[in-house]
Design a protein with these regions (language model features):
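Glycine-rich phosphate/pyrophosphate-handling loop used in enzymes and phosphotransfer proteins
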Residues: 1-207
């Protein structure tokens, strides 16, 4: 990230939704989405509003700028480290990519973030715990019901020792409605994980 761009990166500040972490226009506990929907994860926080970092995220995901993961992961540790410390996770788990997309892109952007975050906070990272076994459609143009159907049976537990973990931090690049994080959180809890928290690089605004 060039020095000229650094001042443009403005982290999400209070008030934010106490469940998903989206920036709120006014002081209250929850955004409109979280007031009407029960999430499977326990709590989430995000680093930036998507509109402020959209070009950087595009380059990170689609232009081979894998090194962005180091910078943004370290910023996650710096700005969200207090939250992560309070929830006391056993491990950091990145949201997995489908193997075909991983081959095409060459890297999983969520895993890049998770590795840098783990290094900075001295927390272990488990990239094999959750596997994506279906190539799902892009989520941005789907309604909530279509998002849920799109992700059904898309993830499996990739190891048989998930019960070693009690509290997990999921890491992803973008939070829109939380459907992906909910799907993985529900799967993890079915296998004995008690708490699933989430941190993301960016999200939309709450209403």
């Amino acid at each position: 990230i060039c020095p000229e761009c650094l001042p443009k990166l403005k982290p999400v500040t209070a008030p934010w939704c106490m469940r998903c972490g989206k920036k709120l226009a006014e002081e209250r506990e929850y955004c409109g989405d979280c007031m009407h929907r029960e999430h499977k994860y326990d709590r989430a926080r995000t680093l930036y509003e998507y509109r402020d970092v959209a070009p950087s995220i595009y380059r990170f995901k689609y232009s081979g700028r894998q090194e962005y993961g180091d910078f943004f992961g370290e910023e996650m540790a710096r700005l969200l480290g207090d939250f992560i410390g309070r929830v006391r996770p056993d491990v950091i788990v990145p949201v997995p990519l489908y193997r075909g997309k991983l081959r095409k892109r060459g890297y999983n952007q969520a895993a890049c973030l998770a590795r840098a975050l783990g290094r900075s906070l001295e927390l272990p990272v488990d990239e094999k715990l959750v596997k994506r076994v279906r190539n799902t459609a892009p989520m941005k143009h789907l309604n909530p019901t279509e998002r849920q159907n799109n992700l059904k049976k898309a993830f499996i537990i990739g190891r048989n020792d998930v019960k070693l973990y009690d509290r997990i931090i999921l890491v992803d690049d973008i939070y829109t409605t939380g459907t992906t994080l909910d799907e993985i959180a529900a799967l993890l809890k079915e296998h004995g994980v008690s708490k699933v928290y989430c941190v993301t690089l960016a999200c939309g605004s709450g209403v």
